[in-house]
Amino acid sequence: MSRIVFDASAVLAMILKERGGERVEMALDQTSQGVATEMAISSVNWCEVLTKLQRSPASLTPEELAGILSGVEVVPFERSGAELAAQISLQAPFISLGDRACLALAQSRKAAAWTTDKLWAHAKVGVSIEILR
C-alpha cells in the first residue's frame, strides 16, 4: 500500500487547476477505484487550504472541500507532530510551520510528502518528497 501526505500547495494546485494538481486528482481517482493508497493531510495544512480558498474565486466551504477530498484523512496536529516539526526545523530552518507539519506527518506515517514547493528539494529530513511541478 502506498502512503501520501499532501501539503496545502498540492491540494490547492488540484482545486485551482494549476500545474501538478492533476497528479493529486489522479491519486484521488485511483483510490476511489479501489487502488490501495492511504492519503492524509495535517489539520494545519487543511487550515491553510481553507484560508487560501476563502480569498480566491474558487471559494469552497469546508464541507465541499471534505467532499472533494473524501478519501483523505485530516489528521490533528498534536504534541508528537509538534515535536517532530520542531526537530525538522533544525534540519531545514527555511521550511515554514505548515510545511513542517506536513513533513512531520509524512515521517510519522512513513509516507511520501507531496508538494508544489520547489524549496523542499533542499530539505534533507528523511522523508520521501514528491515535488509536483
Residue ranges and their predicted role:
Residues 1-40, 53-65:
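Short, well-structured N-terminal submotif of metal-dependent ribonuclease cores
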Residues 21, 46, 62-65, 82, ...:
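A general structural signal for well-ordered alpha-helical segments in protein cores
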Residues 33-36, 89-93:
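A short glycine/serine-rich beta->alpha loop
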Residues 70-92:
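Acidic catalytic patch
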